[in-house]
Amino acid sequence: MDVLKILALTAFLVVLAGAGWLVGWVNTPAMPMQQALDFMQTTQEVKVDEGEYITFSGLNANNAKGIIFYPGGRVDPKAYAPLMFELAKRGAFTVIVPMPFNLAVFSPMSASRVIKRYPYIKDWYIAGHSLGGAMACSFVKNSAEDIAGLILLASYPAQGDDLSSNDLDVLSIYASNDGLATVQKIDSTKRLLPPQTVYYCIQGGNHTQFGWYLTQDGDGQADISRQQQQDELLSSILKFIRMKQ
């Protein structure tokens, strides 16, 4: 075998190995804790359905308001079940959108299909954690007329998704000990959000505790419990969408 063929074969094997590593990387998301899986069961208060989407519907609610949720990058969508369950228990219809390869960047416009599937919902909010929030911003940039509000959890818009001139209601919740979506990053991207944006900082919280999965590399150490962070998160969202706690 001549040198050129050897080099070509070597290059092919390197690319193949890299592709295999990438597929393995995107298909090994942070897995949900058992506490999250406990909220994947229908109860007397909330009906849970798992199909193309994971939906939570309060059995004694009118479900006039809906929340579409984009998970964080490489995080199993079930890790957000407790928050979506609690919101549904208080009257919201909540939808977690599983993403291709667990990365919302591959399907930022997924919310459009959700809205069409459930036409009886009067007011839709779109929310997302980390990368999911950034892609929710991308959706709003292109389809703001379909949305009543935007909820960002440890997230901010990409430079190309400037929403500063939008009149949409926006809630940005972040955490003081977040090592990934740091306070500095939140502050430096405020110029990309509308001036009426409501900001709420969870003191002592971190990036990982916005969901129910194990610690991410690079995150800061939380000074409060996961449950306390989740309670503050729930309370802030309910206030924003004007629902009783």
Predicted regions and their residues:
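Short beta-strand element of the alpha/beta-hydrolase
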Residues: 64-72
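Conserved alpha/beta-hydrolase
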Residues: 84-104
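Gly/Ala-rich beta-loop-alpha elbow adjacent to hydrolase catalytic centers
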Residues: 127-136
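A conserved short beta-strand
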Residues: 145-157, 169
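Short beta-strand/loop motif that positions the catalytic acidic residue
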Residues: 166, 172-174
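Active-site-adjacent alpha-helix of alpha/beta-hydrolase-fold enzymes
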Residues: 174-228
